[in-house]
């Protein structure tokens, strides 16, 4: 996301910003709204590496600003990190292609007591997969009984407690 209104190109959001500023709404409050609702935040150039403009172009500028985190968050860095988001998704896609239960299995949502955890099963024939995801910012404890299962995919180096899900 961008902190300066000058970095945004979305005409509708720029008009909203102008109208709300005229009403006296503070810049910081409007930027918080833009962070969550403006399409420009998802339109920034792909960050391929840590070269200028994230390796997206050798030109003098991009049509919209590159996220300043491109020095640390980019494809080249993610490819070398076994626990990066890119590496995790590659593993997840490989697992999905290999296990038909993840493609064709019947989906059953599991009501969970923790608001950050999404839990469900996929079942087909004699195969069953339990999927637990913590979409919060903090570790989250789940209370589901796990029997005869095998952990096949995770995004942390070390699992100390199988009932404590780390944040994604």
Role assignments for model-derived ranges:
Residues 136-168:
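C-terminal beta-sandwich/jelly-roll accessory domains of carbohydrate-active enzymes
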């Amino acid at each position: 996301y961008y902190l300066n209104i000058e970095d945004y190109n979305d005409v509708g959001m720029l008009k909203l910003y102008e109208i709300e500023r005229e009403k006296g709404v503070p810049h910081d409050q409007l930027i918080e709204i833009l962070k969550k609702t403006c399409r420009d935040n998802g339109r920034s150039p792909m960050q391929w590496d840590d070269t200028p403009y994230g390796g997206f172009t050798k030109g003098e500028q991009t049509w919209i600003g590159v996220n300043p985190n491109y020095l640390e968050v980019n494809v080249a860095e993610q490819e070398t990190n076994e626990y990066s988001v890119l590496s995790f998704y590659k593993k997840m896609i490989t697992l999905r292609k290999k296990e038909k239960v993840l493609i064709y299995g019947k989906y059953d949502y599991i009501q969970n007591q923790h608001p950050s955890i999404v839990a469900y099963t996929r079942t087909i024939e004699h195969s069953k997969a339990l999927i637990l995801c913590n979409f919060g910012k903090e570790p989250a404890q789940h209370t589901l009984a796990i029997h005869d299962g095998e952990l096949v995919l995770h995004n942390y180096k070390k699992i100390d407690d199988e009932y404590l899900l780390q944040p994604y």
